[in-house]
Amino acid sequence: MYKSVEKVVAEYVFTVGSFPFRIKGRVTEKLGGDLAQRVYPWTVSHFYKFNKEAPGPTYPAKTDATTKEEAERLLYTYMRGFTDIAEPNAFY
């Protein structure tokens, strides 16, 4: 038996800097419950580091939204800050 289910509602592929790979972004919709309580989480395949001396990557401040459009806006806002230093997201 599963605890929850999410449906992928949008996927994006970003070309960033000179990486030999592309950064992927995904928006999902948590199913179940009533429509007024729907949650739209988003995630990315990689996180960026502000600079080489940074102790770790810069994580998104907010990854849950109340609408698909808000989740997409948060994803794009995070991607605009991307630098040339990336670390894989182990949970993507």
Language model: regions and residue ranges:
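Mixed-charge, Lys/Arg-enriched low-complexity segments
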Residues: 48-92
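Short aromatic-glycine-(Arg/Gly/Cys) micro-motifs in beta-strand/loop hairpins
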Residues: 32-58
